[in-house]
Each structure stands twice: as structure tokens, then as C-alpha cells.
UniProtKB/Swiss-Prot annotation:
Pfam families: DJ-1_PfpI. GO terms for cellular component: cytoplasm. It comes from the Archaea. Belongs to the peptidase C56 family. This is Uncharacterized protein MJ0967. It comes from Methanocaldococcus jannaschii (strain ATCC 43067 / DSM 2661 / JAL-1 / JCM 10045 / NBRC 100440). InterPro entries: C56_PfpI-like (IPR006286), Class_I_gatase-like (IPR029062), DJ-1/PfpI (IPR002818), Prot/Nucl_acid_deglycase (IPR050325).
Amino acid sequence: MKRLAVILITLALVSSMCITNSNEKRENMKNAKVLMVIAPKDFRDEELFEPMAVFESNGLKVDVVSTTKGECVGMLGNKITVEKTIYDVNPDDYVAIVIVGGIGSKEYLWNNTKLIELVKEFYNKNKVVSAICLSPVVLARAGILKGKKATVYPAPEAIEELKKAGAIYEDRGVVVDGNVITAKSPDYARLFGLEVLKAIEKNNE
């Protein structure tokens, strides 16, 4: 009987510790913000809205920015109004940067020196850096993929950009290498969001 009582008390203590740790994690994440970057035109809709839903449902705040303020239009016709640009961003305000893909990424994001600079800052501050579809090319051009496993939308030009930057290209849906997360296409948008969330939680333990 005594033995059973000891076991029950031990289980209760372990359960209490797990609940406390879970509450602490939620508390740590409560004021955390994720920066999502989109092209002003032709961003890929699912790659914005599906990860955003994952982040917000887990208590994270999300700021969406672009290269210009105002209405941004996705490839599928969804619209979102952004009130800040990448030029207004302070990396210290965020736990992660997520660069959304779509065909607009090549035109508006690949060569954007400010965005490339932001990626470097997030990476050097040990924050989570992530990109999906065509946008891992931005990470490649920022020089943070050298020696890292990564994926990208399977367009020859995009794959070549990663290899040229020294990345270990993998033809997989989502690739995680430390704080760097890349995804291949909108088919993996939700899984990508979940992996970014995991990395944020790990970084904020």
C-alpha cells in the first residue's frame, strides 16, 4: 500500500512538473513575434496563410511585411494589406523570419539587398531563418546555406543558386538544418509552418 502511495505521489509530481514546463513555454512564447516577408505581387497564398495559422494558433504574433506598403496580391488572388516594409524592421523584435515564395519572389525578393541583410542579421543573432518555394534563393544569396542541407522549388535556376552558394541540396518537402528551415513548394506549407514553430520553441526553451 505504501509502495502504491509513493508511486502515485511520484506520478503526481512528474505531471505537475510537465504542466509547469508547458505553462512556462506558453508564457515565453506569448509575446514572441514572427516576421513574414512577401512579394508585393504574386506571392504564393498558401505559403503565407497556412504557416500564419499555425503560428497564431500557438500564441505567436505575426507581422507581415513586403518591399512596399499597401495591398499585396497573391498568385491565387488573395489580398493582404501590409503596413510596414522590410525597411522598418528591427530583428530584435522577432524570434524568426519566414520568407514566403511564389513567382513574385524572383522579381521582388531575390535581389533585394535589404532583405539579404535582414537574413544575415537574423542568422547571426541565432534566430530562426526560414524560406519556402523559390525564396530559399534569398538565403543562398545571403551566404547562410554554405554546408547546410536545404531544399527549394525544383526549378533548375533555383537549384543551381543553392548549389552555387555551397548548400547541400535535398529534393525533399521540408529540410531542417539547425535554425535554418527550407521547404520545396506550397504542398508543404503547413508542415513547413509546424517545423518553424518547433525550431522557435526549441530556441526559446
